Amino acid sequence: MAVILNIFPDHIDWHDTFDNYVSSKTKILSFLSKGKSERKIIGSNMGKVEKNLPKNFDIKSKNNLKVHRELLLSLGEATKIIGGVELYNKYLEYIKKYEIKYPHRMEQFFELKNKNITFFNDSKATNYHAVSEATKLFTSGKEEGILILHGITKETVENKLNLDPVFKYVIIPEDMNIKLGDHNAEIIHIKHISNLKDVLVKVLNSNQVVLFSCGGSSFNDFEDYQVRGDYFKNTILSMELQDD
């Protein structure tokens, strides 16, 4: 059994080229038993992995899945192999109860129910890919998205931020070097993250999702992503927003 995750340009720091990075990640496949014929490639990296496989390597593809589902499906496949159906069912029950409810990772911490405004803290998202995938999680909703970025970005040739069209506002600190892909959002620059509250007061309305998914490391303003996430949550709660 082998699980390969996160083959994306912002992870190539130590490999010089993207091809070297993919080759290094897929080396684990050489340790698999040759007697096993079925291989599953789950998610959006199939093409990158497939070209590193032997020609007689039989695979079954499950593609077009969002990042969180890729991780969950990979863990599910591993659970089946290790513990069979009984352990797999326990895993499913656990996921239903705890999936993406960890602090600073798509953490829903506040909601105005009457106005239908929900606030998410995703401070742990420190690269473009994590942010891009986070915005896709709201595609099916009727809410308008407000994305808040922050931090020191990783710059690579292939790396850019791709937003789901549901996000109509993007708030960016002036000192953040950001590379946006195609989008239809209004870009709002703020002098510093401490000025966030002033901007939010102007754009908050109703039927909205407010996503603090940063796209960069926290060290220019905070000790770590946890302190940054707590800062955002405290900022929102201190606004004492009314739900009437």
Report each predicted region and the residues it spans:
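Active-site regions of enzymes building and remodeling cell-envelope glycoconjugates
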Residues: 1, 49-67, 166-168, 182-195
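Flexible active-site lid/hinge loop adjacent to a nucleotide/diphosphate
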Residues: 1-63, 220-224
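Residue-level signal for inorganic ion chemistry
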Residues: 2-5, 21, 75, 122, ...
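Short glycine-rich anion-binding loops that position phosphate/pyrophosphate groups of nucleotides
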Residues: 9-10, 46-47, 126, 152-154, ...
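Short glycine-rich phosphate-binding loop at a beta-alpha junction
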Residues: 39-43, 170-171, 209-213
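Nucleotide phosphate-binding/pyrophosphate-handling subdomain across enzymes
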Residues: 65-167
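C-terminal helical cap/extension that packs against the catalytic core
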Residues: 155-209, 243-244
